[in-house]
């Protein structure tokens, strides 16, 4: 298994916490299925089938957030409420008032919830306490925030911070394209997005298209800046760096795939192998990326 997206946070390096302590902290917030009246439920689930909420290997930690959400469209609630309101109007001789309609809508929701379908999703969390990384495999900050909020609620005085670098991703990516020179250890791939800083926010996107230096430089000279850039690191991992320092479309390249343990006998052994390989390579990639962005800002 490999993370596809990286929402990156910082912890002290090293972060002194044991798996046993973290397990104790997470246990009160373990996932419970929705009750008949719940629209949504979230909590920690076991990354493997052994029931433990904390998976550890080679000093790396994996957590898994489970989310169940009931599918009850507003249109359905409104339709049923409208039918029941008409029945009440016929009985009492006048239309229900605003307060009565509000109560009726709540009653309809409670009535329909037990019959609503559920959808489930899982969000992976990787903690590297040695190097001080906390990474959420989420495609959007909102999804990552769900994890962080529950983690802060679970772990007392969690020493978590956002990642602050000296040079903004936008400035760095624009400079790399302007000079036609990627930072050491990285290469620029074929996808990019250039956006104007003006009111119109004019945007140019290259998708699987060779980036011609003169063409890109012309757009930059016209006032556009790079907001997304496809890159590869050490010929091992491809990804897209965004203006917010989120990393998307993470994928191991052939060199990594060739190192995958083919001797694994079962799912647990394959999972162990994948985690060890992924966390080791991503930890090194993140360190190199921070260096390419001028290093981390000094804490005030």
From Swiss-Prot:
Gene Ontology CC entries for this record: bacterial nucleoid; cytoplasm
Keywords: Cytoplasm, DNA recombination
Record localization: Cytoplasm, Nucleoid
UniProt keyword Cytoplasm present: yes
Keyword RNA-binding: no
Reported function: May be involved in recombination.
The family this protein is said to belong to: Belongs to the RdgC family.
Protein's name according to its UniProt entry: Recombination-associated protein RdgC
Species whose genome carries this gene: Herminiimonas arsenicoxydans
Organismal lineage: Bacteria, Pseudomonadati, Pseudomonadota, Betaproteobacteria, Burkholderiales
